[in-house]
Amino acid sequence: MVKVIASSVRKGNVLDVDGKLYVVLTAANFHPGKGTPVTQVDMRRIVDGVKVSERWRTTEQVERAFVEDVNFQYLYEDGEGFHFMNPVSYDQVVVDVETMGDQKAFLQEGMTCVLSMHEGIALALQLPRHVTLEIAETEPVVKGQTASSSYKPAILSNGVRTLVPPHINAGTRVVIATEDVSYVERAKD
């Protein structure tokens, strides 16, 4: 464990508070006109998923847990959760549905992801910045609708909705940014 000042806590950090591990969801520093500056932190307890809000003076010491980011390859999903394998040591890790969150829609078999590990437990998952998916369904283009840079709604092969340029049709493979589900470019494969 490393002691850090509260004002240096950022989203994604893992903190040890009273012997329990928490993942930081949001952290904001407030400097009121009167009084001492404070850091407001919203966290999720790793063990049971309970959300907690804490307020510390910005100079107060908090314990940050050691977290290691390791590359893992996605294998499959079953009733236990999502199975990943370390391509170097061949160790397998199961990630639960709560840790996975909304990112599960973008998982593809064999995809390399970064898992944040603490004592053999996966705390968080980072997908690649871009994934290539096929357009399953999109609306036809309305002729003459070129006055503004128009995008049309589309449904990807994984069921996620996004906006694509008018020249993209169903069956076209496109590159999508996983962070905000936005269209990047037409796939070059």
Curated annotation (Swiss-Prot):
Main location: cytoplasm
Regions annotated as coiled coil: none
Annotated GO MF terms: translation elongation factor activity
CDD domains cross-referenced by the UniProt entry: S1_EF-P_repeat_1, S1_EF-P_repeat_2
Subcellular localization(s) per the UniProt record: Cytoplasm
Function statement: Involved in peptide bond synthesis. Stimulates efficient translation and peptide-bond synthesis on native or reconstituted 70S ribosomes in vitro. Probably functions indirectly by altering the affinity of the ribosome for aminoacyl-tRNA, thus increasing their reactivity as acceptors for peptidyl transferase.
UniProt protein name: Elongation factor P
UniProt lineage: Bacteria, Pseudomonadati, Pseudomonadota, Alphaproteobacteria, Hyphomicrobiales
